[in-house]
Regions:
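N-terminal secretory signal peptides that target proteins for export/translocation
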Residues: 1-11
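Sec-dependent signal peptide recognition
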Residues: 13-19
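C-terminal motif of bacterial Sec signal peptides marking the signal peptidase cleavage site
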Residues: 24-27
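Bacterial signal peptide processing site
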Residues: 29-32
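Post-signal peptide N-terminal segment of mature Sec-exported envelope proteins
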Residues: 35-57
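Basic amphipathic alpha-helical segments that dock to polyanions
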Residues: 67-83
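Accessory beta->alpha helical hairpin/"wing" motif in late/C-terminal subdomains of nucleic-acid enzymes
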Residues: 84-124
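Low-complexity, intrinsically disordered terminal/linker segments enriched in charged
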Residues: 110-208
Length: 208
């Protein structure tokens, strides 16, 4: 008789525990627990992270500073743009100035990326996209967390490949905050946490 009662008790206890864990599971969503996988998903899906890098190409009359900028020098070395020395108009400095246009090679490489517009520019060209490499650390304090992650630029075309070295890795740290529906990337400034835009702007380049 005692054995039957003990078996019944164990069966009831198992049922109660099963039901309890079921209700506990229903009350928690995957976003309630900040894992590295969830942090990576939140970062890679954020609008700031997904925003492609746009390079602005200006043709026509430009200042000497703009013509000799690092990006312009890359395009010159590739033979995609050429410049003719010109006198600077009033308001455009420092001299000398340059009349910039696409070379025949540049027409082949760049023209398909900017369409058939005939104006002198500037032309916006999407050249690279961020790629998340992984989460390197999470530091939690209450309903806030600082997440450190690594990423790199993935060129979208040959202009992007010329301007961005895909082998350079960047380290950033962004704030996440826990709400009633789970964790979210912080998109507004707080007293001690970086937004996603700040995290990407302040990224630290790492040696390949």
């Amino acid at each position: 008789m005692l054995g039957i009662q003990t078996g019944s008790f164990r069966g009831c206890l198992k049922t109660v525990l099963t039901v309890g864990f079921l209700f506990l599971g229903l009350g928690c969503s995957p976003r309630d627990f900040l894992t590295r996988r969830l942090a990576g998903d939140l970062i890679s899906q954020s609008e700031a992270f997904k925003l492609p890098q746009t390079f602005w190409l200006t043709t026509g009359l430009v200042s000497n500073k703009e013509f000799n900028s690092p990006e312009s020098m890359v395009l010159q070395r590739r033979g995609w743009i050429i410049g003719t020395l010109q006198k600077c108009p009033v308001g455009l400095e420092p001299p000398p100035c340059w009349d910039v246009e696409l070379s025949p090679l540049g027409v082949t490489a760049i023209r398909p990326l900017i369409g058939s517009e005939t104006q002198r520019g500037p032309f916006g060209i999407e050249v690279a996209q961020r790629t998340l490499e992984g989460i390197t650390g999470i530091s939690k304090a209450g309903n806030f967390a600082d997440v450190e992650f690594m990423w790199h630029w993935a060129p979208l075309n040959q202009v992007g490949a010329a301007l961005y070295d895909g082998g350079v890795r960047y380290r950033s740290m962004v704030a996440l905050r826990e709400f009633d529906d789970g964790w979210r990337v912080v998109n507004e400034e707080t007293h001690s946490n970086q937004t996603m835009e700040d995290a990407l702007r302040n990224a630290e380049a790492m040696a390949p």
